[in-house]
Amino acid sequence: MKTPIYLDYAATTPVEFEVAKKMMNYLTIDGVFGNSASRSHKFGWKAEEVVDIARNQISELIGADSREIVFTSGATESNNLAIKGIASFHQNKGKHIVTSKTEHKSVLDTCRYLENKGFTVTYLTPKNNGIIDLNNLKKNIKKDTILVSIMHVNNEIGIIQDINSISQICRNHGVFFHVDATQSVGKIPIDLKKIPIDLMSFSAHKIYGPKGIGGLYVRRKPRVRLLSLIHGGGHERGMRSGTLPVHQIVGMGESFVLAKRKIHDDFIHLTKLKNILWNGIKNIEEVYLNSDLQQGAPHILNVSFNYVEGESLIMALKDLAISSGSACTSASLEPSYVLKSLGIRDELAHSSIRFSIGRFTTEKEIIHAIKLVHKSIHRLRELSPLWEMFKSGVDLNSIEWDHV
């Protein structure tokens, strides 16, 4: 078995061989290397043609019109474009935005940026299982609210939000609805013909495509208007200027084709492996599930092991590539803001591990991972004075610790 075993698919995925092979045809002199904006010769025409094909492939997976797809550098840029673009264009109608405390940093930091520009932002606290309270959402939509931004699947705990119901609430209140679907596109069926979402962000590298390319869905009917962030040649219908990376777009299109073909089998495969993993570790003493198995995505399992530091466990599990949270924030020693928003105390948040599985994960790898987790937890707790006190019956919550 090859080690380390990769269990960090929520951070990024390997590029499918078919995707990489196809991308190579759009890089060199022997292939289609032209600029898709060059309208005066065959090299440009051919590049534009394959970009249009990829745009169609992407739209087919999510039930969109190809003209509603705007290419970006990834989901972070898409989130920025959606939120800042709507806020800038529609600020005369209102300057209030609603989001949640458990959103990705690219949404939260964008909202904080807008607060410094005179906007007000309401950050909803989810229920303990991570789900947004729809009644609370309704109460917080005001006359000057212009945008609600809620992610579909949380990148740390995998909880799935009811974007269908949220979209209806937003439509009834005349408010734009943006969805960060980075962790759901290609894993959970989404049909934008049936769900009235106005803007949706997604990325290629989360579904076995290349890094550095993503998209923003912008609804045409009824038309959604926003101001661009990047100005220049007026590419992407004026919403995102810059020469299109044809090879990356082709790779993204191919990864979306494969996702559409494999989404059902992937879902079954991921659900099976996640259940095996949880069933294999749930009997460890003082283990806590930081999500909801019934309302969670098939590829993410977030667990806390009390009396074990998450960072220490990651170091002990050197044969497993896992995360102590979002890849974008796991370098921080602060406990996960997502888990803290769910009411989880700092000690448990610090002891959390995110396992995220993917298309290439095998049952044999999961079984091996379970054995490694058991072994490492046992060894680390043997070294922990807190664990010894807990096992001796000491109520650690009643102790007043000195902070020097």
From Swiss-Prot:
Keywords: 2Fe-2S, Cytoplasm, Iron, Iron-sulfur, Metal-binding, Pyridoxal phosphate, Transferase. InterPro entries: Aminotrans_V_dom, Aminotrans_V_PyrdxlP_BS, Cys_deSase_IscS, Cysteine_dSase, PyrdxlP-dep_Trfase, PyrdxlP-dep_Trfase_major, PyrdxlP-dep_Trfase_small. GO terms for molecular function: 2 iron, 2 sulfur cluster binding; cysteine desulfurase activity; metal ion binding; pyridoxal phosphate binding. It catalyses: (sulfur carrier)-H + L-cysteine = (sulfur carrier)-SH + L-alanine. The active site is at C328 (cysteine persulfide intermediate). Its EC number is 2.8.1.7. GO terms for cellular component: L-cysteine desulfurase complex. Its main location: cytoplasm. SUPFAM superfamilies: PLP-dependent transferases. It is found in: Cytoplasm. The keyword Plastid does not apply. It is an enzyme of class 2 (transferase). GO terms for biological process: [2Fe-2S] cluster assembly. Master enzyme that delivers sulfur to a number of partners involved in Fe-S cluster assembly, tRNA modification or cofactor biosynthesis. Catalyzes the removal of elemental sulfur atoms from cysteine to produce alanine. Functions as a sulfur delivery protein for Fe-S cluster synthesis onto IscU, an Fe-S scaffold assembly protein, as well as other S acceptor proteins. Homodimer. Forms a heterotetramer with IscU, interacts with other sulfur acceptors. PANTHER family: CYSTEINE DESULFURASE (PTHR11601:SF34), CYSTEINE DESULFURYLASE FAMILY MEMBER (PTHR11601). This is Cysteine desulfurase IscS. The lineage of its organism: Bacteria, Pseudomonadati, Pseudomonadota, Gammaproteobacteria, Enterobacterales.
